[in-house]
Amino acid sequence: IAIVSTGLIFHDSAERQHLLGLKYGTIILDDAHRARRRGGLGARRDEPNNLLNFMLQIGPRARNLLLGTATPIQTQVSELWDLLRILNEGREFVLGRTIFNPRWGDWQQALPAVKGDYNPADEREAWEWLKNPLPPGAEGGPFPALRLHLDLPDDRFYSDRGYGSLGYAAQSALDQAREPGFLRQHN
């Protein structure tokens, strides 16, 4: 067990580098809202600050990760997505495999869906939203049928299959995802 001051993390210290070389059972970050983009003015305003950068690197080195904050959004909605990115690193069931499908990882694109202000235009687009990350079958809705059709266990959270490769039953199940508020309820 180690209790480490975030002051060591904010400054690029030798201790910080040492911590990045270890593996962890559980990491708990208090005041997680401090892990965010630099902000302010200038070309570097959208870059991660040292704490966010550290957490993005160390997240995959831990089995469990807990972020504590009373105020996940200090000034910008993007700060909430920064915290979600930390939780997603090495896991891919929070925001999905963002390199292959950036919809949930892009706060500007995902926010209208999360708020219920956006619904997919058709089943093909619904599949693009749902396939990565694909919720477990226990979530109900179309997910049990989709997982059964794709032969995906609940511990795999994405499908790389295109809409055209889905059978009729799976494509029909996606109609539920076009209902108002579906993405808000299942995100």
Give residue ranges: language-model regions.
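Inter-lobe coupling linker of SF2 helicases/translocases
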Residues: 2-24, 41-63, 67-70, 91-187
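A short, flexible beta-alpha/helix-coil linker loop
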Residues: 9, 34-35
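Walker B catalytic acidic pair
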Residues: 30-31
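Catalytic P-loop NTPase motifs of RecA-like helicase/translocase cores
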Residues: 35-38, 42-44, 74-76
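Conserved catalytic segment of ABC-fold P-loop ATPases
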Residues: 63, 78-79
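Short, hydrophobic, well-ordered secondary-structure elements
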Residues: 74, 81-84, 185
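A short helix-turn-beta junction within AAA+ P-loop NTPase domains corresponding to the substrate/partner-engaging
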Residues: 80-94
